[in-house]
Amino acid sequence: MTHQYPALTTEQKRELQDIAQRIVAPGKGILAADESTGSMAKRLNPIGVENTEENRRLYRQLLFTADERMDKCIGGVIFFHETLYQKADDGTPFAKMIKDRGIVVGIKVDKGVVPLAGTNGETTTQGLDGLSERCAQYKKDGADFAKWRSVLKISETSPSELAIMENANVLARYASICQQNGIVPIVEPEILPDGDHDLKRCQYVTEKVLAACYKALSDHHVYLEGTLLKPNMVTAGHSCPTKFSNQEIAMATVTALRRTVPPAVTGVTFLSGGQSEEEASINLNAINNCPLTKPWALTFSYGRALQASALSAWRGVKENEKAATEEFLKRAEANGLAAQGKYVSSGMDGSAGQSLYVANHAY
């Protein structure tokens, strides 16, 4: 029976939509700085920096203390639990520092992927236990949005019906719990770029996965205006012999979204999925210039694609902090322009052109 039991009050809905709109205001996107402690090792070890709490704090500090140029192109920052409770050198909590700049604070709330028995190496995401209490606490501590990542992969046998259904359901349950606590959920069903599949296959799988997600969100009475979607762009697999143009990637991506994502959704914040910094900006720009009608904000939620050059410039040396912050700002501004279809690429030179692909990427 389709009886309606109101899940949210008008005030709650208004607050959620307002938060979502602030994050994806024109020319703004998200800095994903929510790498787990283990993932930070993969960032710091290659540049010769020990993965300690203090080094992680110093690194995040150089991102968060970037000058006012950041405020024009970053609408939200996703924190990891540890970072939410860290402070800058002057004693200001990072969360307060970001909030005071008019940037929305977010928090990663999932607890990582676990194997889904009976599938060929597929996964589901854990973290629903105690999520409501954690969300209530995070809201008190300054967070207004959250992120939960589900992972699907393309192969002969996957994604299976089971993996699609289970991940859609867990994302919807998470989204519902967030909204009850005044937190805007970012729904992230990432289809990994591993494999030799072509653009068509990725588009087809992306459509099936997104359709399942929005069916589940509807079943769970999630208020779509108070959500954001964080999908992969539609690209061929990394081992695909055929190379596709930025325009082809944009057309396949926007077509998949138009077929599955309701216009009520406030914004789509793409993940970079191991693309190089430059590639992630060029593709986002092409998506915004795609000649199809696009009812949502189409912007970025990038981790590596905003940070790779900054990390290389920093190398853990205090004297390099300024240069590292400049590299971060350069990418942030590039993506702010790309989110408006106004980015002009300066070529694929240097570290910005280096692929950031990691096979079977786990955060």
Swiss-Prot record:
Pathway of action: Carbohydrate degradation; glycolysis; D-glyceraldehyde 3-phosphate and glycerone phosphate from D-glucose: step 4/4
Catalytic activity from the UniProt record: beta-D-fructose 1,6-bisphosphate = D-glyceraldehyde 3-phosphate + dihydroxyacetone phosphate
Active site: K230 (schiff-base intermediate with dihydroxyacetone-p)
EC number from the UniProt entry: 4.1.2.13
Tissue expression notes: Expressed in brain but not in liver or muscle.
UniProt GO molecular function: fructose-bisphosphate aldolase activity
Keywords: Glycolysis, Lyase, Schiff base
Membrane-spanning segments: none
GO biological process: fructose 1,6-bisphosphate metabolic process; glycolytic process
Sequence similarity: Belongs to the class I fructose-bisphosphate aldolase family.
Enzyme class at the top of the EC tree: lyase
Assembly, per entry: Homotetramer.
This protein's name: Fructose-bisphosphate aldolase C
SUPFAM superfamilies per UniProt: Aldolase (SSF51569)
Residues with site note (Necessary for preference for fructose 1,6-bisphosphate over fructose 1-phosphate): Y363
Residues where substrate binds: R56, K147
InterPro entries: Aldolase_I_AS (IPR029768), Aldolase_TIM (IPR013785), FBA_I (IPR000741)
